[in-house]
Amino acid sequence: MKKFMLKGTSVLLAVIVSAGLTLFGIAEAWAQQKQKISYKLPAELSKFTQQHVIDVGDVPGHQVRIFEVHRTYPKDLLVVDGVRVVEEWLRGYSDYIDTNGPAWGYGIYSLENGDKIFTRLHGTSQAIVHPDGSKKNTFTGVITLAGGTGKFRGILGTLRTMVIFDPKAGVIEGQWEGEYWIEK
């Protein structure tokens, strides 16, 4: 009986050590693959290409809007896993009362090598009216990297964004930061 318990204990110890080393190796490899992203995009590189606004009619200023944004990226502004991002198309919709409320969307980053990265966006916009009557619209949200093509098929990640925008003037500028990893 004593001999059996020693064998059982040895086997159990070997299994625990193996599992621990395996989990440590997986966690270490996963952590090594995470890459940081941080960039700012000035207003002249983004524009609303389409906007369709419908008044809801329940309260003044309540509108639903479908929009499309095109962004161009100059050399070396945004590089993902060694490949330069050339442009981005974002298509989304918002549910605003006087430019306050939620917005959602879907985006595609096009890379220099022809690959694409797909994104989902959600967040909230807030309009602040200054004493002089001028207005500042700020969108704060989260972008989820949700796969892609070619080299970026397994890309995942999260970016936080803050964007200043004026849908009437077509102006958009902002900053993005977060991290991504590519699952094999």
Give, region by region, the residue ranges found by the protein language model:
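Beta-strand-enriched cores of mature, soluble protein domains
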Residues: 27-184
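N-terminal secretory signal peptides that target proteins for export/translocation
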Residues: 1-8
